[in-house]
Amino acid sequence: MMQYTDMHDRYLLRLISKKIFLYTEMIATGSLIYGKCLDQLDFNKEEHPVGIQLGGSDINDLVECSKMSEQRGYDEINLNVGCPSDRVQKGKFGACLMLEPNLVGDCLKNMQDAVSIP
């Protein structure tokens, strides 16, 4: 969840449960590519396993961000196709992608081919 599941929240959740899989808040691909929120990629090594949740629909951007995420040590990459926010949907990601299953499939295929993590 945006503005909630930051590294401090995830660290607290890890203290509460060693078994849950943790995810970042949704991070827009454009924000990562243009360096606006690279600090959101940071996590504490005690958070593992931890996945990153990307928001985007441009295949090349998603591939680039997937590679960045793998290099940072994430265990998994998740593509957000559920955020109902109007602001997010104006950027053509989130829940509006449910209407474009072929695009989602192409995005996921290219992301999978680019990295070795799920």
Model-flagged regions — what are they?
Residues L41-G51, G94-P118:
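Alpha-helix-loop-beta-strand connector modules within alpha/beta enzyme cores
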Residues Q53, N78-G82:
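Short beta-strand segments
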Residues D9, E64, V81-C83, K109, ...:
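Low-complexity, compositionally biased segments
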Residues E70, I77-N78, K90:
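A structural preference for short, pocket-lining loop segments at secondary-structure junctions
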Residues M26, G30-L32, V81-P101:
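Glycine-rich, proline-tolerant flexible connector loops at the mouths of alpha/beta enzymes
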Residues K18, G73, D113-I117:
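Short glycine/proline-enriched coil/turn segments at helix->beta-strand junctions
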Residues Q3-R72:
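Glycine-rich, positively charged N-terminal anion/phosphate-binding segment
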